[in-house]
Curated annotation (Swiss-Prot):
It is a peripheral membrane protein. This is Photosystem I assembly protein Ycf3. PANTHER family: CELLULOSE SYNTHASE OPERON PROTEIN C, TPR-REPEAT-CONTAINING PROTEIN. Essential for the assembly of the photosystem I (PSI) complex. May act as a chaperone-like factor to guide the assembly of the PSI subunits. One of its GO terms (biological process) is photosynthesis. It is found in: Plastid, Chloroplast thylakoid membrane.
């Protein structure tokens, strides 16, 4: 059963109905429409915290989707689920796969930086300063890339880069 038939969320239902209308109007192959349908259902399940169902839908969308740009967003969303479940290594794998297909995906760059920063904090708490420094430097590199692509976003990251001396204020853009 399509998710919109069992979903009580008004905004999600509205998105689903609009997506169905767009799919009917735009020229797309049956496979492209099916891939988008799975992607849409994955987003719906993910927004409700139904991560196993979301992953099933995303994997099916990934199997069907041929467009690299669209595949990058599917991979990105899979990475989001793994990150939210604390599976950071898997999340990094999917974020990197998304970036391989679409290097202009600031949220993926930001999320990679967040994971490295988190690993740096954990290493610092364990007094492993060398690993902490390495992780913080990796986080800085990914945040710099994200900021270059979306200079008005990631304000906290920009402040962290400045306060830690990892980026001079004049080199942000």
């Amino acid at each position: 059963m399509p998710r919109f038939q069992k979903n009580d969320n008004f905004i999600d239902k509205t998105f689903t109905v609009l997506a169905d209308i767009v799919l009917k109007v735009l020229p797309a192959s049956k496979q492209e429409k099916e891939a988008f349908s799975y992607y849409r259902d994955g987003m719906s399940a993910q927004s409700e915290g139904e991560y196993a169902e979301a992953l099933e839908n995303y994997y099916e969308a990934l199997r069907l989707e041929e467009d690299p740009y669209d595949r990058s967003y599917i991979l990105y969303n899979i990475g989001l689920i793994y990150a939210s479940n604390g599976e950071y290594i898997k999340a990094l794998e999917y974020y990197h796969q998304a970036l391989d297909l679409n290097s202009r995906l600031p949220p993926a760059l930001n999320n990679i930086a967040v994971i490295y920063h988190y690993q740096g904090v954990k290493a610092s708490e364990k007094k492993d300063l060398e690993t902490a420094r390495t992780m913080f430097d990796k986080a800085a590199e990914y945040w710099k890339q994200a900021i270059r692509l979306a200079p008005n976003n990631y304000i906290e990251a920009q402040n962290w880069l400045k306060t830690t001396g990892r980026m001079a204020s004049e080199s942000l853009y």
